[in-house]
Amino acid sequence: NGCEIEIAVYSNLSRDHLDYHGTLEAYAAAKALLFRFTSLKAVIINLDDTHSSLMLDAAKANPSQPKILTYSLTQTNADYHIADLQYRLSGASFTLISPAGRYTVQSPLLGHFNVENLLASLIAAEYAGFALADLVQFVPQLKGAPGRMQVIQDAERLFVVDYAHTPDALIQVLTTLKRHVTGQLWAVFGCGGDRDRGKRPLMTQAALDHANPVILTSDNPRTENPEQIFTDMKQGIDFADHIVHEIHDRREAIKFAVAHAQAGDIVVIAGKGHEN
């Protein structure tokens, strides 16, 4: 409450921090408080997210009546939407359709979520006073954050390091890369200790649904017994028809994937991002 925020963006919300909030509904309600800040002049909301209506209602109830701008990758009724979206391992391209006109955008950032975040950033910058025509010229020069869909090329294999540590984030990373893999799509991941235990088997199921082979490993156990974390990760999971390795030492798990991945394979190393 000590910040005089003028532009607020709602991108998305998925299961996380339930060890603190208790339920996803309570977590969403906490996020919605941002859009009631009376200092706000503009609110930018992703219509593609399932909680967007809650955020819209909060913004509309704001006595300061901030300007509400919406965006979407799929809905043409949004103020800003896109067409001709194409994904490549080198990034994405699309046509941005806005109140100011249509613009061709070439982004070097990999992944669906990066298209969403880029769109939100362009809208915020435009509202802050920059022309979209100028902004899109700088997009090809963007560099991704370390550990966020960070690509490491090795001969005919690809390794991707990402911070994904929720079921939804892991699904997004894997489905993005599945479009491009010609061999096997590997997932190396773990679950943090002293956090929401309920999402652990959901993480495993997400990996099994979208990758094969899968390596279960450690993330950051904090003060929790690592064995309990692995037990939770396997709770109620059917491992039939999947190649699954359980390697508790994260360094050894990564070494195993590097040693066994073949030409055409993509290996996702998820959970810790830039941390080493």
Spans of model-derived segments:
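Acidic, Mg2+-coordinating active-site environments of NTP-dependent enzymes
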Residues: 4-159, 234-236
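ATP-dependent carboxylate-amine ligase
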Residues: 65-67, 100, 110, 120-276
